[in-house]
Amino acid sequence: GLVKYYKKVTKKISLIEPSKNLNSILKKKFKKDKIKVFKNKLVIKRKYETILYMDVIEHIQDYKNEIYLNLKNLKKGGFLVINVPAFNFLYTDFDKNVGHLKRFTKKDFFNLSKKFHLNIKKLEYYDSIGFFLILCSKLKNVSKNIKIWNYLIPLSKVFDNLFFNKIGKSLICVLEKKK
């Protein structure tokens, strides 16, 4: 998904995947595209225009330090794009089972932007239907059916607009490194 999109707009892409299994899968998948896949931090001495954390930092205990270290590799005026699960009160056994340490709110990103002197370019919740489904499943202890998301995501985009992106099961943040 995202890699295909970014291949159209940039010539150099590097991926980081600390999981040994997923790392080797990504290396095989992107070998012919000449996309480099690293196990840990950005290790090359190159400045990036954009760094993406797509459903990553919720797995990292010291996520602020992780971001701080990688901001050194971001060009001035570059973008840090972070996608995370939203609202700690929605934390479920599913989150725990997949290794999520927390869920985030806009306040987390306001604090992050102040701490690292970043401009917030976009900060909004999305997947409002997912928000209500998780909330209902928590309140009624209903088992989750993952297949239902495939049908509801397009509908959720309509509801996100109706709710002005004030609620959602996920949060996207685009931060700009000051020039």
PLM segments and residue spans:
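Conserved SAM-binding loop
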Residues: G1-T92, F110, C173-K177
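Hydrophobic anchor at the start of a short beta-strand
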Residues: I13, I120-K121
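Short aromatic-enriched loop/helix-cap "lid" or pocket-rim segments at secondary-structure transitions
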Residues: L26, T92-K96, F132-S137
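Short, hinge-like loop/turn segments at secondary-structure boundaries
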Residues: K31-K34, V98-L101, K138-V142
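Acceptor-substrate binding/catalytic loop of class I
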Residues: D93-L112, Y125-Y126
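A structural motif corresponding to the C-terminal end of an alpha-helix
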Residues: K115-L118, K177
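A C-terminal cap/extension of S-adenosyl-L-methionine-dependent methyltransferases
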Residues: Y125-K179
